[in-house]
Regions:
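Short, solvent-exposed loop/turn segments at secondary-structure junctions
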Residues: 15-18, 45-48, 61-63, 91-94, ...
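Basic, ligand-binding patches in group-transfer machinery
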Residues: 60, 99, 153
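Short glycine-/acidic-enriched loop or helix-start segments at secondary-structure transitions
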Residues: 51-52, 96-99, 148
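Catalytic core and acceptor-binding pocket of nucleotide-sugar-dependent glycosyltransferases
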Residues: 129-218
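Short beta-strand-to-loop acidic/aromatic patch adjacent to the donor-nucleotide binding site
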Residues: 82-94
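Conserved donor-nucleotide/metal-binding helix-loop-beta segment in metal-dependent transferases, i.e.
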Residues: 93-125
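N-terminal anchoring/stem segment of glycosyltransferases
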Residues: 1-84
Length: 218
């Protein structure tokens, strides 16, 4: 019998025609492993033959990566009624449901550990941030609405707007003062994989989920 996460909404957002089928498949893989309060696919046009266990909700067309990042940064929470959402993509979904821990719901944000890269993932005062990647991420409603509540703007750095960088690095001090809790690096290494780092035994450790770059550890 599958475990049900009553406080978690499974959610994905993509409007690119060549990605919709894969996104639905990624959601179905998650739903085959765990049950959720609901599963929502956000697109600009309702897909034909959408599985009955996935709810369609309108979200604006993505013209470029900046459109995507702005919507996830400031609007994702409008689609979530539960305390948390698990954000997934066509290349980011659950691998091993047995690794899920209800303890994770104490955190407002969880994502894969970022590698140590010179001049990257640094706050303005030079603090290095390791958590984390937004492609497969657990987010609380408090976190999702924080940009609206605090009046945070999506900042452009490294040539484009990245919503996870804004939430975890650029605005981290304001969000910490607001009470946002980020998953510690050691737990994040079990939560999700994106890049080989010391904390995940350079990719040789099983993880709950992944974002890109990973063979399925099934």
């Amino acid at each position: 019998m599958k475990k049900k996460l009553n406080d978690v909404t499974l959610i994905a957002y993509d409007t690119r025609p060549d990605k919709i089928e894969g996104t639905i498949l990624g959601m179905q893989k998650c739903l085959s492993r765990l049950d959720f309060a609901s599963a929502k696919l956000l697109t600009d046009i309702e897909p034909k033959n959408l599985p009955d266990n996935i709810i369609w909700e309108y979200a604006p067309h993505i013209n470029n990566i900046n459109d995507f990042n702005l919507y996830v940064f400031s609007e994702l929470g409008m689609h979530v009624e539960t305390s948390h959402a698990l954000y997934v993509q066509d290349h980011a979904y659950i691998l091993d449901e047995t690794l899920w821990s209800d303890r994770w719901l104490q955190y407002d944000y969880a994502g894969a550990v970022w590698p140590i890269v010179e001049n990257s993932y640094l706050t303005d005062d030079g603090k290095r941030i390791r958590v984390g990647n937004g492609g497969f991420s657990l987010r609380s409603r408090k976190l999702m609405f924080a940009p609206r509540v605090l009046g945070l703007k999506l900042e452009q750095r490294q040539g484009f707007f990245n919503e996870d960088g804004n939430l975890c690095v650029y605005h981290v001090d304001k969000l910490l003062k607001y009470g946002i809790k980020y998953m510690p690096v050691e737990e994040a290494a079990t939560f999700s994989y994106e890049n080989p780092v010391l904390e995940n035994n350079y990719g040789n450790m099983k993880t709950f989920g992944f974002h890109r770059n990973h063979r399925e550890n099934e």
